[in-house]
Amino acid sequence: MAIERTFSIIKPNAVAKNVIGSIFARFESAGFKIIGTKMLHLTVEQARGFYAEHEGKPFFDGLVEFMTSGPIVVSVLESENAVQRHRDLLGATNPANALAGTLRADYADSFTENGTHGSDSVESANREIAYFFGEGEICPRTR
């Protein structure tokens, strides 16, 4: 199976809970290599651009408001079958449906404030990674 990259966001509510290290530890325990990461505070323009595919949907404005309410941590993760494995670790988007032991079951507050984001396909991962990271900011780990 080929090595893939996926994109992850630790959202403002999870950052505010001070669980960044716990989430990173779970990524690494699950076999992911963290090959790029940074903390930033999204502007409204950045959030609207990142979530452009949802513009016009009823939840869009609330999502932008939430994602700009505090710092986030964006990361590039690498492993075999990274996209699906990361989504499995995150759990269902709606935390009410998330299995026990998933990140959203443990750290989400609501459907919108669900603690984490993960790419839904390799194509999305490539686009999302490029939105936040230049090639020089990603450090493949060979050891």
From Swiss-Prot:
Gene Ontology process terms (BP): CTP biosynthetic process; GTP biosynthetic process; UTP biosynthetic process
Membership in a protein family: Belongs to the NDK family.
Gene name for this UniProt entry: ndk
EC number: 2.7.4.6
Localization, UniProt: Cytoplasm
One GO molecular-function entry: nucleoside diphosphate kinase activity
Alphabetized UniProt keyword annotations: ATP-binding, Cytoplasm, Kinase, Magnesium, Metal-binding, Nucleotide metabolism, Nucleotide-binding, Phosphoprotein, Transferase
Assembly information from the UniProt record: Homotetramer.
GO cellular component: cytoplasm
Main localization of the protein described in the UniProt heading: cytoplasm
Residues at which ATP binds: 11, 59, 87, 93, 104, 114
Disulfide feature: none
Transmembrane regions listed in the UniProt entry: none
Residue positions of the active site: 117
Cofactor: Mg(2+)
Protein's recorded name: Nucleoside diphosphate kinase
Organism: Cronobacter sakazakii (strain ATCC BAA-894) (Enterobacter sakazakii)
Function: Major role in the synthesis of nucleoside triphosphates other than ATP. The ATP gamma phosphate is transferred to the NDP beta phosphate via a ping-pong mechanism, using a phosphorylated active-site intermediate.
CDD domains: NDPk_I (cd04413)
Catalytic activity: a 2'-deoxyribonucleoside 5'-diphosphate + ATP = a 2'-deoxyribonucleoside 5'-triphosphate + ADP; a ribonucleoside 5'-diphosphate + ATP = a ribonucleoside 5'-triphosphate + ADP
InterPro entries, sorted: NDK-like_dom, NDK-like_dom_sf, Nucleoside_diP_kinase, Nucleoside_diP_kinase_AS
